[in-house]
Amino acid sequence: MPTQFAPLQNDTFLRALLRQPTEYTPLWLMRQAGRYLPEYRATRARAGSFLGLAKNPDFATEVTLQPLDRYKLDAAILFSDILTVPDAMGLGLYFIEGEGPKFERPLRDEKAVQALKVPELGSLQYVFDAVTQIRTELKGRVPLIGFTGSPWTLACYMVEGGGSDDFRTVKAMLYNRPDLMHHILQTNALTVAAYLNAQIDAGAQAVMMFDTWGGALADGAYQQFSLHYMREVMKHVKTEKDGVRIPSIVFTKGGGLWLKEIAAVGADAVGLDWTVNLGAARAKVGERVALQGNLDPSILFAQPDQIRAEVAKVLESFGKHSAGSGHVFNLGHGISQFTPPEAVTVLVDAVHELSRPLHK
């Protein structure tokens, strides 16, 4: 494995996460390599399937770099899927066109849950190979983000056997058999920490934990079944590699209510969805963590002038930068597959241009 990667030319994103001064507000987009890009759709057709794309380091590298060839983004994010982890745990991941991910062997009874173990990371070598290959081919243009799902979010898919509207099965287990739920979450936490560390060893320069379904939990249950295990993960994730800081981001969609508690989880930055007021969030936790977000992805269906106006609102909501403040611009969730690619050009240019006066 090459230990010598090209020197980083643009570290704005990493500095913002560490609340160091930057010349402008950096940005990247959740799902920036995705179906809204015609070049992504062409590569996916060649790969034959989503898993054919994600499990092949050459294809994964190609699609990771596509948005960077088109837009002046400040970070790349590994092209993969959070469900590679339960797949490695033996649950049998497959995709049905139009229905999304499914598991052949969901965790529905005590026997299945008790059999769950931290997997051999060798079964995820294709992910680590992709990380190293992407980092090499980036040639230092921008940093590379590695990522994982949170223990709770992974558990939702593992128990439900796929996506869900109401999380009935996983919540029934949580309330009826909390002992089984905790066993799943503890196993997931150990796995996820090792998985992120292996991505860091392979070349990831920052890591992010997506708690997509944390917001489905009641207050109280969130702290016990999601937040606690994210804290467990953060305790074990490397904060540096070869003397260089590796910043971390956590993101609970629908987690605005628990902002102060999320900020204390041990990550350098907290991602926000579009329901949160960024300025209010900064007032609450901005001395402690950087913030990432939080434009409504649907704004990208508006006219260019409207996109610029909404970008300005988000930037002004965060306000002028001071010592120890950090903001990474992003959407409040993943970009829609129906987004016109040219809208992203407007967004990127607007963020870079309109944020500069706020950093003086």
Curated annotation (Swiss-Prot):
CDD domains: URO-D
Pathway: Porphyrin-containing compound metabolism; protoporphyrin-IX biosynthesis; coproporphyrinogen-III from 5-aminolevulinate: step 4/4
CC annotations in GO: cytosol
UniProtKB keywords: Cytoplasm, Decarboxylase, Lyase, Porphyrin biosynthesis
Annotated site (Transition state stabilizer): D81
Gene Ontology MF, one: uroporphyrinogen decarboxylase activity
Subcellular location: Cytoplasm
Cited PANTHER family: METHYLTETRAHYDROFOLATE:HOMOCYSTEINE METHYLTRANSFERASE RELATED, UROPORPHYRINOGEN DECARBOXYLASE
Record-linked HAMAP family: URO_D
UniProt similarity note: Belongs to the uroporphyrinogen decarboxylase family.
Subunit-structure text: Homodimer.
Protein name in UniProt: Uroporphyrinogen decarboxylase
